[in-house]
Structures are given as structure tokens and as C-alpha cells.
């Protein structure tokens, strides 16, 4: 009931704020402010006009509090919670005002409000002695994991940590509503992972589904999300059931041929359709959560090896066009975004290299020349010899050794000597007698696209990712780590 009332306050505040924004942009003083030539004076005038219309964080907070008071339902939500709902509206509206996001949308009753929070342990109060949340006179016990991490994060019963933000979150898990409490505590969080210093460097070569990693003492080649499989067959069956349900409930919305009628139509949804819709959403949620967990574990393993990460700038839109399902399942762009965010929070470095200038897939440090290769050729002949190295691994090695935006052949050779033996053991480097002449390129293109893994996916899951997945893979993943992160005493397949 309180969350539904919070949704109405959110929509009322957003509607009023959008109306004020329209009036402000149509006003004469707003248009005249853009005629001011000096940038600092123009920005100051625009900010003054915006404050006059109440379009700032505290203005929308007061607006939401007034809507709460006028509703006559002050017993459902407190003054503090209403103000923070206004702050949430401002964060959405601010992106729209400064052209960093689209027009904010109203929250429907079906979608609802997902969270409510308060700062300073007021309104929504966390009681550490009771391990409970107290809100509007009700006490809600929390199920807290009794682990060392939670004990250190929350503090002891005698000296609990001060709560900065207490947030109640509503989630749909397994087609049921679940309620969680999120706490932001004062101070530094407990250390879960010890990251390497920034003096250590690792190079990444990120593809639509896999990532190659090379540093002077570590090399790896794995899927971005080994267990982030999307159950396409189940999704297809659910969508067919939903389509049949819609046809049964809305026969007047279809032509005799079976096509939907053009124009605006009113669709009736049965309870069975709503149940199928929740099941479909839960399938996508499971895949997204598994993908997020795999990305986080892989990022932690990367930063445990090196504090500086070099990678090429990539056109992720091209991946979506050419490798649609792989891009959706593995989410390489999301992986890079989380990698940058983790590096920023941990005071580490992620360097994006110029792809057009360095041309990793074409360069050969032995001859210091550039040779274009077709996409299907996944092996590189090192210096024109009979030594073949995986194209992805070699690109990651080149990225690791970039100095001042240029290739450094001396550093590349030193790194190559350090990891060559391990790469041979894992099958990423091969010595094959190659034919000469035009048959050479044809032979390279016909080689297996990916090398055989040096270790089983179960071993990598145990040693690298450290957690068990709730989604079992439906195919055999080729995953390999060599160097520090894996036991290289095992013999390759």
C-alpha cells in the first residue's frame, strides 16, 4: 500500500515538473538568457531561472512533500520518504534537461515503484540490535547472513556502524514479490579481493563472446559469461502460448487471415497470460543475474593479476549487427562498462587504445609489418615462420606491451618469451609445417577457429569463478586459463 502511494506521488511530482519545464523553456527570460555571450554569465542566469521555477533537487523534494500532504494519506508515507521520492524524480529529470537521457516516463501500476529510501537513519530506520527495519510503526525482521563479511560490514552489536542510507527494495524473484533492505554504511567496506598494483599491466582482446588476456606472468582465454546461457527454446514456447492466449481473448483484433488489425486496439489480458508474462520475465532475469555474476568474477580475477588494463576501442554496435545472439548472451559492452566502473572505484586504470593506429590483428613484432587477414583466419604465422599463435591471444599480448600509444617490439619479445611455453601447453601456440605459396593462406583459414582448451570448464569454474551457477550450460564451453590463475601441471587435451 505504501509503495503504491509512493508511485502516485512520483507520477504527480513528475507531471508537475514536466509542466514547469515546458513553461520555463517557453518563457521570454529563458530565451533571452541564451543571448548572453559570456558563458559563465549565461550559465548563472539559466541556473537562476531554473531555481525560480523550482526545477532543482530540493524544489522537487518540496513538491513531492506537498503532494503527500494534499492527498490526506500522510499515515502511509512520512515526510522524509516523500522528499526522497522527489529527489529520485529530479535525477531522472536532470538527465532530460541536460540532454543526457530521454524524457522520463511515468510509472504504471503494473510496474510499480521498486524502492524507497531515507538518509541519516530517519523515516526508514535500521535497528542493528534487533536486526530489523522499523518503518511507520512496524518492525520487519531481516534475514542477515552470519558471515565474516556481513559481521565486519555491519559492525558488532556493541559498536554498530553508522547507517547513512537505508533503502527498502522490491524485487520479483521466481514470479513472487521479495523484499530486501539495502544499507549504505559510513566508512570503508570490508576487503573481499586484493588487487594487483597499477605497475602490473595486462592486455585484453574482447570479442563478441570471448576475451583473451595476456600479461608477462598470466594468460587466459574464456567466455565473458560461461554460464549466461539464454533458454531460447523455453522463451519461444512461452511466446507462442502468450500469442495464443491473446488471440483467444481478443478475437476482434485480428483479420480473418490471422494478421492483427491496424490502428489503436484495446487488448484484454487473461490471468493465464499474466502468469506466462511473469515466467518470461523471470527467465530473462535469471540470465541477466548469471551474466552479471560471471562478469564480476572475471573482472575480479583480471584485477588480481594486474592493476592496469589495456584494451582496444571496439564498435559494439557492429557486434550486435553481425553476432546478435552472442552479443546478447555475453554482453561485451556491459562487461567493459563494469570493468571501467570497478577500476574507478578501486583506483586502478583502464586504458583504451586506438584501434586504427595500432591495428593489433595485423601487426607482427618479428618483422614489424602489418598484414591484413580475413575474419575467418584465427591463427597468425609469427614472422612468416611455421610457429602459429592464436590471433586473439596475440592481439592481447600486443595490447599488453603498448608504450605511449605505440608498439614496443622489445617489450613484446620479452613478454612473448615469458608466456610462450605456457601457451604451447594450452594449445594456443602450434608448430606446424606450412605449405608455401598461395596455399599458405588457404591452409591458415581452414584451421580450427579456436584452440582446444587446456583445462575443463568445471576446473576453471572452481579455480577462477569460485561460485556455482544456478543455470547449467547447454553446450561445451571452451575455457582456458594458464599461468597464476590456474594449475598448469595438468596435461592439455
Please place each PLM-identified region on the residue numbering.
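Stable alpha-helical structural segments in soluble proteins, enriched in small hydrophobic residues
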Residues: 2, 9, 13, 81-92, ...
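Residue-level detector of alpha-helical segments with a strong bias toward transmembrane helices
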Residues: 21, 111-115, 215, 402
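Amphipathic alpha-helical surface "interface" segments used
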Residues: 29-43, 104-122, 261-262, 268, ...
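Acidic carboxylate diad motif detector
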Residues: 35-174, 329, 333
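Positively charged, helix-rich recognition surfaces that bind polyanionic ligands
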Residues: 179-493
